[in-house]
């Protein structure tokens, strides 16, 4: 089985891992209530998705 001839340096390792990161979720305003919500998901504040009420949200 092959083994590395040289040790991987900190710089090379960190440069390789530079693209491994978390991405921010795609937020968009809800067309019904205007609150920010995750795209392609039901709005947690009003319960609407695609112009229809999907879940019943109790108003506080």
From Swiss-Prot:
<comment type="similarity">
    <text>Belongs to the bacterial ribosomal protein bL32 family.</text>
</comment>
<dbReference type="GO" id="GO:0015934">
    <property type="term" value="C:large ribosomal subunit"/>
</dbReference>
<dbReference type="Pfam" id="PF01783">
    <property type="entry name" value="Ribosomal_L32p"/>
</dbReference>
<dbReference type="GO" id="GO:0003735">
    <property type="term" value="F:structural constituent of ribosome"/>
</dbReference>
<dbReference type="InterPro" id="IPR002677">
    <property type="entry name" value="Ribosomal_bL32"/>
</dbReference>
<keyword id="KW-0689">Ribosomal protein</keyword>
<dbReference type="GO" id="GO:0006412">
    <property type="term" value="P:translation"/>
</dbReference>
<keyword id="KW-0687">Ribonucleoprotein</keyword>
<dbReference type="InterPro" id="IPR044957">
    <property type="entry name" value="Ribosomal_bL32_bact"/>
</dbReference>
<protein>
    <recommendedName>
        <fullName>Large ribosomal subunit protein bL32</fullName>
    </recommendedName>
</protein>
<dbReference type="InterPro" id="IPR011332">
    <property type="entry name" value="Ribosomal_zn-bd"/>
</dbReference>
